Amino acid sequence: MSSSENTLLDGKSENTIRFLTFNVNGIRTFFHYQPFSQMNQSLRSVFDFFRADIITFQELKTEKLSISKWGRVDGFYSFISIPQTRKGYSGVGCWIRIPEKNHPLYHALQVVKAEEGITGYLTIKNGKHSAISYRNDVNQGIGGYDSLDPDLDEKSALELDSEGRCVMVELACGIVIISVYCPANSNSSEEGEMFRLRFLKVLLRRVRNLDKIGKKIVLMGDVNVCRDLIDSADTLEQFSIPITDPMGGTKLEAQYRDKAIQFIINPDTPHRRIFNQILADSLLPDASKRGILIDTTRLIQTRNRLKMYTVWNMLKNLRPSNYGSRIDFILVSLKLERCIKAADILPDILGSDHCPVYSDLDILDDRIEPGTTQVPIPKFEARYKYNLRNHNVLEMFAKKDTNKESNKQKYCVSKVMNTKKNSNIKNKSLDSFFQKVNGEKDDRIKESSEIPQQAKKRISTPKLNFKDVFGKPPLCRHGEESMLKTSKTSANPGRKFWICKRSRGDSNNTESSCGFFQWV
């Protein structure tokens, strides 16, 4: 992390609420990267590092047996939604800091209500053997369920909410946080596109409904929509629009106004127009008049800032050249525009193909006074939703299953070896057993008559030199050795070729790939 980003994160006062969104692409895997690798898989350490008060992670890719680790974070309320059937997929978490009682934000950050999904049709426990939908329980549901979609029946609504894509939390200060991971239709199927558009429409209809009943909205997460032309490196290149240092986004959009508008209203990408219709700062005049949300990052950084990307294609190694798009947002109601004090992306934070985005809001006069009555913790809080209060029962069962499998493996290995010293290794771990066989050449192997003598000899395999097989790598236009790749196309499957080893970037960027290509 750069020193400039450290300064940004440190510049937060006690009176501001820091919102942070991060598509972690697997909550376990991002702990493999600095600085998180030194945090012992502690979410509390991660949240303190960011100095964040309200955090949402997308693509948790976790399951019920692992939620005990992420659903009980000291000093935070935890709200987690995971897919109902598909394991290791999607998943959204929202964590709310619990300040000390003498902290200025203590009353403002009190959680009033919380719910899972966007339609209100999902249910929450209502006693030992019963459950009730959020929309039918005024004590749990946040509201705004009317006219979400005229064709949306209960079955369709439950399908929309079955993939663990949204968590909503209402605070005592009147803010409703909507943590979301919108579908992307990565397979480009007709069914996937219909699901994507319906989810987006229902979500934004719910936002409007909540706004009408007086709620202040913070919509944060991976929306999977690139809102403007200046937010898409790929489209800028397709339109042959050069990005030079003196040219800012404002000048670019003025010079290529038609292309900037076409990018939004393109009939092949209806999700962009749908998304822009909720934005008060949209380039579309009609949309901006009806828009009710402000893009905090764009407001603070202005439209003049280019290359403000939040996601990159990692398979093509496009992050080093900053060739990506912006699909992660923190959007707030117009009512909160005056509260926005800071907002930015953190592109130097690794651990995912996305980077974190944060916004600082000072709620000023909207702050709740100390006399406010504290309400019960919502039933959707992870400790209640997933039964994490009673000695971590889920984790106990997980350990039990693991031990059974381990014992089964030990039995099978011992039976196959069938040696005279089985009794001596019965209580040893599987790892130490294999280590001894491979590293110390256990005497039991010598005693076996079934192993031929020639098997004991080391077999030396001649090592082939890379250049002996493919020849010396040709030089690219940068004068550097090129990189060997394998074709995966149907026309030339498995055929080798050389390309420039630098990552793809803007066509006028001399530091990016020169476009060199040569078949082997």
From Swiss-Prot:
Catalytic activity: Exonucleolytic cleavage in the 3'- to 5'-direction to yield nucleoside 5'-phosphates
Residues given in the record as Mg(2+) 2 binding sites: 222, 224
Source organism, top-level taxon: Eukaryota
Family label: Belongs to the DNA repair enzymes AP/ExoA family.
Subcellular location: Nucleus
Site for Transition state stabilizer, residues: 224
Free-text cofactor note: Probably binds two magnesium or manganese ions per subunit.
Gene field: APN2
InterPro entries documented for this protein: AP_endonuc_1 (IPR004808), AP_endonuclease_F1_CS (IPR020848), Endo/exonu/phosph_ase_sf (IPR036691), Endo/exonuclease/phosphatase (IPR005135), Znf_GRF (IPR010666)
Disulfide bonds: none
Positions annotated to bind Mg(2+) 1: 59, 353
GO cellular component: nucleus
Organism name: Saccharomyces cerevisiae (strain ATCC 204508 / S288c) (Baker's yeast)
CDD domains linked: Ape2-like_AP-endo
A GO molecular-function annotation: phosphoric diester hydrolase activity
Protein name: DNA-(apurinic or apyrimidinic site) endonuclease 2
UniProt-listed Enzyme Commission number(s): 3.1.11.2
GO BP terms: base-excision repair
Active site: 181, 222 (proton donor/acceptor)
Site label Important for catalytic activity, positions: 328
Cofactor(s), names only, from the UniProt record: Mg(2+); Mn(2+)
Role: DNA repair enzyme that cleaves apurinic/apyrimidinic (AP) sites and removes 3'-blocking groups present at single strand breaks of damaged DNA.
Site (Interaction with DNA substrate): 354
Pfam families in alphabetical order: Exo_endo_phos, Zn_ribbon_GRF
Residues bound to Zn(2+): 476, 478, 500, 514
Zinc finger residue extent: GRF-type: 476-520
Extra facts: Present with 414 molecules/cell in log phase SD medium.
Keywords attached to this entry: DNA damage, DNA repair, Hydrolase, Magnesium, Metal-binding, Nucleus, Zinc, Zinc-finger
